[in-house]
């Protein structure tokens, strides 16, 4: 924990928006994006560090805060507070999470089972949001964080859409091009299958094995009707791959089946081969 004098000095050196009248003391910038800035701040009442988000479009700030408040899930950062700055902009405070963005975490030499395990946890969180009528619309590795305690968090719900939003808001083109479903890029109304597309794009960056790429390609089909129809179906195919079973999206060749069989039953096969080699050696020694 940083000492009180050090916090005061750090705050004095940092020039941020005026937060007079709030319970927060700004310390530094945690991140910037097209929607606004996230600051590291100190909650002077509870004496703890928080992430304080301030965006330029108040309606979207309120939208994200409301969505986060209603989605109580281990994979979604909880909202602590919501309010208005002296200049009229809205802010909200959330738990300050320490960890790595998913793209940086994957670059640190994680094995395939670890990476796919994290991907499945992202799917679980997104499926939970879909069950509550929320479509994220900007899923990408940069918006997923792996925390220092192993938690996997889906961030940045500022452009998420809900059934209660206006048709114009739901059709607004938002997101990141390489993860954006075609219907989203065309400015059409989207449903949860736009997030399935984005998850498929994320999956492509995780592994280059044929079954995994087949899953990703199915999730990224141009037509929503050709994709997995929900996140649970996508996750189920990934789980089948991890369990050594055939995946629905991939038509296996004989060599693929043999390789999968070998991965699934590696230890028994090694034991049988060891036994056979030992028997052959024994027979050879007896007849020498």
Regions picked out by a protein language model, each given a short descriptive name:
Residues 27-33, 38:
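Protein kinase glycine-rich loop
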Residues 42, 98, 117-120, 126-127, ...:
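C-terminal lobe helix-coil module of Hanks-type protein kinase domains
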Residues 42-49:
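Conserved N-lobe loop of protein kinases adjacent to the ATP-binding glycine-rich P-loop
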Residues 56-70:
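AlphaC helix of the eukaryotic protein kinase fold
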Residues 82:
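Activation-segment/catalytic-loop signature of the eukaryotic protein kinase fold
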Residues 87-101:
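Conserved short submotifs of the Hanks-type protein kinase catalytic core
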Residues 101-111:
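AlphaC helix of the protein kinase catalytic domain
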Residues 149-183:
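Activation segment of protein kinases
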């Amino acid at each position: 924990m940083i000492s009180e004098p050090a916090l005061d000095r750090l705050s004095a050196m940092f020039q941020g928006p005026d937060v007079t009248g709030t319970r927060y003391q700004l310390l530094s910038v945690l991140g910037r994006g097209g929607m606004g800035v996230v600051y590291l701040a100190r909650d002077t009442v509870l004496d703890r560090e928080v992430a304080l988000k301030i965006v330029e479009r108040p309606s979207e700030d309120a939208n994200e805060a409301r969505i986060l408040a209603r989605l109580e899930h281990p994979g979604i950062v909880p909202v602590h507070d919501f309010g208005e700055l002296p200049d009229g902009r809205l802010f909200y405070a959330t738990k300050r999470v320490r960890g790595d963005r998913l793209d940086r975490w994957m670059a640190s030499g994680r094995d395939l089972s670890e990476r796919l395990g994290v991907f499945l946890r992202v799917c679980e969180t997104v499926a939970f949001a879909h069950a509550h009528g929320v479509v994220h619309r900007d899923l990408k590795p940069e918006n997923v964080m792996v925390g220092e305690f192993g938690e996997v968090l889906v961030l940045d719900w500022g452009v998420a859409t809900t059934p209660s939003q206006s048709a114009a808001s739901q059709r607004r083109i938002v997101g990141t091009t390489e993860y954006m479903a075609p219907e989203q890029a065309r400015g059409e109304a989207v449903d949860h299958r736009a997030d399935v597309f984005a998850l498929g794009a994320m999956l492509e960056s995780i592994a280059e094995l044929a079954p995994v790429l087949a899953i990703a390609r199915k999730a990224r089909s141009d037509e929503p009707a050709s994709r997995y129809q929900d996140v649970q179906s996508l996750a189920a195919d990934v789980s089948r791959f991890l369990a050594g079973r055939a995946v629905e999206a991939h038509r296996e060749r004989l060599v693929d089946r043999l390789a999968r069989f070998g991965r699934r039953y590696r230890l028994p096969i090694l034991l049988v081969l060891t036994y056979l080699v030992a028997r052959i050696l024994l027979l050879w020694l007896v007849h020498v």
